[in-house]
């Protein structure tokens, strides 16, 4: 479990904190290993990875709470979490926020969608503000803060989105986000009108050019930036290996491939530092064991990656 809250990470940072979106303990591990200081749970990617269905309102609080508790317990960096529309009215939002904070989330993103099957439809302002008040009440005294999100389209509804964010801050939200931001011009417009911490959502780019840079947006008050790559990268790798292994009718491609860690073979176990577990167990007084998989030796944790102590991941 992270020794620092997301609030603490943001307060100590002198630049925009970049947080990739994750969906399970393996994706969280990969994000932590390369050095990112925080991460965001993607509701849409959880829907695909956990339940095998598209992002279309299928996920429920139990799904999100369960994976949040697993990721938070086994990771050394703080996790923010997308709680969709809070899974119902104000009372449902209150309950969801309470449970998610208890599960280990360090920030909760609550959106103003009026229909989770069509997230472009916005709730009436006052209905959304009721949910914001409920979430804030639930998080009182918790080491978890609210990210108030609007789905307003900057092309046609930017002023509406700005007003919703401004009011959310007035109600007590510590961070806001206009989730469809896609350029520096609109980000600047928001920054000039909405006080407080701001999240730049799902940064993208094309032809080698990012839509914004952290250097551009940090002076505007955007101290948190999210992005998606983990699920696509995982699927890309599995399909690459799968096509080759299917053609060979074996696992030779995987066993022979030199990956980013330099570890050979078919197992990802070394990336989860099994020998660290054995060291911790031995520190309690027992004999130091060697970790093997059905008698096969397992390599040590790869060099050049962040190795979080096992004590912080159990």
What are these regions (language model features)?
Residues 230-314:
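Extended, intrinsically disordered, low-complexity segments
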Residues 1-2, 250:
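Intrinsic low-complexity, intrinsically disordered segments enriched in polar/basic residues
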């Amino acid at each position: 479990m992270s020794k620092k809250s997301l609030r603490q990470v943001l307060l100590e940072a002198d630049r925009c904190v970049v947080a990739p979106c994750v969906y399970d303990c393996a994706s969280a591990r990969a994000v932590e290993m390369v050095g990112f200081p925080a991460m965001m749970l993607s509701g849409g990617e959880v829907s695909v990875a956990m339940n095998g269905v598209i992002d279309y309102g299928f996920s429920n609080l139990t799904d999100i709470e369960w994976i949040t508790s697993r990721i938070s317990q086994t990771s050394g960096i703080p996790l923010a979490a997308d709680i969709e529309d809070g899974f119902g009215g104000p009372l449902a939002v209150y309950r969801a926020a309470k449970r998610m904070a208890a599960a280990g989330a360090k920030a909760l993103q609550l959106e103003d969608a009026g229909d989770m099957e069509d997230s472009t439809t916005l709730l009436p302002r006052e209905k959304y503000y009721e949910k914001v008040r409920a979430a804030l009440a639930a998080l009182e005294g918790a080491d978890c803060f609210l990210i108030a999100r609007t789905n307003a389209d900057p092309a046609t509804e930017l002023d509406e989105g700005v007003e919703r964010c401004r009011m959310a801050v007035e109600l007590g939200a510590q961070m806001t986000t206009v989730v469809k931001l896609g350029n520096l011009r609109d980000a600047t417009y928001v920054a000039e009108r909405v006080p407080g911490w701001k999240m730049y959502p799902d940064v993208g780019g094309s032809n080698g050019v990012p839509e914004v840079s952290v250097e551009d947006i940090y002076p505007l008050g955007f101290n948190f930036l999210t992005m998606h790559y983990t699920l696509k990268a995982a699927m890309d790798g599995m399909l690459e290996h799968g096509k080759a292994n299917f053609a060979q009718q074996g696992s030779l491609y995987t066993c022979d491939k030199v990956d980013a860690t330099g570890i050979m073979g078919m197992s990802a176990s070394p990336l989860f530092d099994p020998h660290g577990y054995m060291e911790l167990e031995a520190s309690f007084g027992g004999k130091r064991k060697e970790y093997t998989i059905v008698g096969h030796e397992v390599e040590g944790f790869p060099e050049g990656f962040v190795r979080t102590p096992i004590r912080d991941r159990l």
